[in-house]
A protein has these predicted regions:
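Acetyl-CoA-dependent GNAT
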Residues: 5, 9-12, 19-93, 104-106, ...
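Conserved GNAT acetyl-CoA-binding A-motif
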Residues: 111-123
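Conserved acetyl-CoA-binding loop of GNAT-fold acetyltransferases
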Residues: 135-143
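Structural motif
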Residues: 21, 114, 136-137
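Conserved beta-strand-loop-alpha-helix junction that forms the acyl-donor binding cleft
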Residues: 121-131, 148-153
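Terminal substrate-recognition subdomain of acyl/acetyltransferases
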Residues: 155-163
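Active-site acidic-Proline motif in GNAT/NAT acetyltransferases
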Residues: 91-97, 125-126
Length: 163
């Protein structure tokens, strides 16, 4: 399931689709982890501005994930001193079908094009499903920031080393 057509580089016209996916996925994934108001009072304008800034910033590569012509998720890669899988979100009905694995392979290919030997990603510690996924994909836990006043802002860091 590593079809490159699955990953379509996002343009400014895709920002609303991405934040629509974000709202849907956050509502099913982060309820009970993030404060409810982050889903219930979702600030569409703020998220659109944030997404447009990423899409327009050459340090970011934003992709819609598509299957059968339908947007089923998105991923964002940030390229700075280290390549970071900034976000990987897949709607629940398409999880456990190889889409996430294909996304990790896509990020690895991106790293290969940049001559990078590894990439990292951050995850909310309470998101046990994502953590288990990253570990199954070969991620090694290399750090944690558990000192934030707001528990949902804490993170753990995984590193993926390319073979």
């Amino acid at each position: 399931m590593t079809d490159n057509k699955m990953f379509v580089e996002a343009g400014k016209d895709d920002a609303l689709s991405i934040i629509g996916l974000r709202h849907k996925i956050w509502s099913t994934t982060y309820r009970g982890i993030y404060p409810d108001h982050m889903m219930d009072d979702f600030d569409w304008v703020w998220h659109e501005e944030k997404e447009l800034s990423r899409i327009n910033d050459p340090a970011y590569s934003v992709y819609l994930i598509q299957k059968d012509g339908q947007n089923i998720g998105y991923l964002t890669i940030h390229q700075a001193n280290v390549i970071t899988l900034q976000s990987l979100y897949i709607v629940s009905e398409y999880q456990r079908q190889g889409v996430g694995r294909a996304a990790v392979e896509h990020v690895k290919a991106f790293c290969g094009e940049c001559d990078a030997a590894s990439f990292i990603c951050y995850c909310v510690p309470e998101n046990v499903n994502a953590r288990a996924f990253y570990e199954r994909m070969g991620g090694t836990l290399i750090g944690a920031d558990l000192t934030n006043d707001e528990k949902w802002q804490n993170s753990v860091t995984y590193q993926f080393t390319l073979a």
